[in-house]
Amino acid sequence: MSKCVNGLRSRLTAIIGAQWGDEGKGKLVDILAEKYDYCARFNGGANAGHTIVVGGVKYAFHLLPCGILYQTCMNVIGNGVVVNIPTLFEELAQLDKNRVDYTGRLVISNRAHLVVDGLLEADAKSESDSRKKFLGTTKRGIGPTYSAKALRQGLRVGDLLHWDTFLLKYHSLNAKLREQEGIQIDTQKEINTLKDYRDILINRNMIVDTISLIANARKDGRRILAEGANATMLDIDYGTYPYVTSSSTNVGGVCTGLGVPPSAIETVIGIVKAYTTRVGEGPFPTELTNETGKYLQKTGHEFGATTGRPRRCGWLDIPILRYSIQINGHSSINLTKLDILTGLEEIKIGVNYLLNGKVIDYIPAQLEELAQVEVEYITVKGWKQDISDCKTFSELPVEAQNYIKKIEELLGIPVSWIGNGPQREKIILKD
């Protein structure tokens, strides 16, 4: 690990969500990407939603790396990502509309797997099946695509380079979906669509071996920013299973999703919202179902960038942040949306979980136990002053400073960045 905790000087920095997603990862990625040579997505698919506001224009990226907005940054969709090609081109159309030139600055791993219509249908069918537990997926085909990958039945982006072979694999996958799931789709329509997009991808040389590309970039001393999607508590292994996503959302996913060794990762910044939110089902120990929760939801505009679903809101949860630090080895924290807490008389912080009346130092793996935990809180004073124009830590109200210092004390790592508004420039670099 590098001594650089804020990512400004590191050669490879990973941006990891430390809660249940929607922490505001895209904003810091956007800020840092300007200083990096490469910006690389390593996991997930169009179930992610990174919203960025630049020059008054709002961009909602689901597949594109946020570095696409910078002319000096090469953007990589890594092998750990599952790619819906039509969705990708919808995002590229957004760039075309706003005259963002990305020529020669976007490549896709030939090992990344494809989300196709049959897998989208499988996702929708699974979620609507009343016999199964409702998991609250985004219905973007993510789970079925990773399932097909694990079953060695999936389609890869590189398969598009060999069209006749691709068609054989495509029809084989759809035959299995018909037989096993009863799924019928218009295969010829999708084939025609994919053929058109394939020609564009090939003409633009966008399908490449990204593992070799990144290895050579590292050898040449280029700086790489690894952009995570989702978050630690949604990780397929470490999250609140089964209310999780289907990929490795932690720092290990950087290695498996980009093909880089653990020793290459110098800085790991954990993105932490100043309170806690989660979308969909699953346990949420610090959840607020009262007026304060509604206030946070309304003031924070807590609605999913991908689905538009309202987010459940609660107090900051220190136990899950300690857990994220254990797994990811965060160098520092980017505390986002601090401005949303403005106006609250008091702010609570969940500092410990109690199970059967005893403090525990772990996150229960069984949901039955996690649902039973009680939360021990401490209370700190809130602040009334508008903090959106603060540019340094010392300009923040003393109560806001104390809130941040308490978080640092409880976690044992520094807060290096502080978000105090939705705009790109509304962020404080804390010394």
Swiss-Prot record:
Record: residues binding substrate: 305-311
Residues annotated for IMP binding in this entry: 22-25, 47-50, 138, 152, 230, 245, 309
Cofactor(s) this protein cannot do without: Mg(2+)
EC number annotated for this UniProt entry: 6.3.4.4
Catalytic site: 22, 50
Catalytic activity: IMP + L-aspartate + GTP = N(6)-(1,2-dicarboxyethyl)-AMP + GDP + phosphate + 2 H(+)
Keyword flag Metal-binding: yes
Note accompanying the cofactor annotation: Binds 1 Mg(2+) ion per subunit.
NCBIfam families xrefs: PRK01117.1 (NF002223), purA (TIGR00184)
Family: Belongs to the adenylosuccinate synthetase family.
Protein name: Adenylosuccinate synthetase
Species name: Paramecium tetraurelia
